[in-house]
Regions:
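OB-fold and OB-like single-stranded nucleic-acid-recognition modules
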Residues: 1-178
């Protein structure tokens, strides 16, 4: 009988998130205003992605690690895919949305990480399990005291795009601080 061995990366997802993914995203985060200006100055979006972001394969969107600051103007917790709206103080976009859970949409945290790729997993299901575990680690880490309307915060996180970013921009956070 064939059995798929347990993939160690899935079992260690929270540890990988805390020790590698979140620190990598914070260390390489670019202020959104500067990032958007540099993307606009690039020859084309693919060139900008190569210089400023990360794309594991050409058929994937580009992932950017970003830092944004502003005032929380809305918090939506009615949906399981909760989000807050951040009115920006330092970027050409007027606002961004930041995922707050309890469920994150997408795989931005997994796909922006340069340390592992699909080839490190036994199959598509395990790669998906790893993405869910990474998202849950972020949600758990940020669950302490969620921001409220009127709070001024700084968010470090990841967003993906196929072209020059525009509103609404959805950021998956790795750190939220006052």
């Amino acid at each position: 009988e064939l059995r798929s061995p347990v993939n160690p990366h899935v079992a260690q997802a929270a540890e990988i998130y805390r020790g590698q993914i979140a620190p990598q995203a914070v260390k390489t985060a670019q202020p959104l205003g500067e990032l958007l200006a540099r993307i606009a100055q690039a020859k084309d979006f693919d060139s900008a992605c190569g210089l400023l972001g990360y794309r594991a394969q050409p058929e994937f969107p580009c992932y950017f690690n970003v830092k944004v600051s502003g005032e929380v103007v809305a918090v939506n917790t009615r949906s399981r895919s909760g989000k807050l709206t951040l009115k920006l103080t330092d970027a050409p976009l007027s606002s961004v949305e930041v995922q707050i859970g309890p469920v994150y949409r997408g795989t931005a945290l997994r796909d922006s990480y340069r340390g592992l790729s699909y080839g490190d997993f036994n199959d598509q299901a395990l790669f998906g399990d790893f993405a869910r575990a990474i998202n849950q680690a972020s949600i758990d880490e940020l669950a302490g005291s969620p921001p409220k309307v009127g709070d001024h915060i700084t968010v470090y996180g990841v967003f993906s795009s196929w072209q020059a970013p525009a509103e609404p921009l959805l950021i998956t956070p790795v750190r939220i601080q006052p």
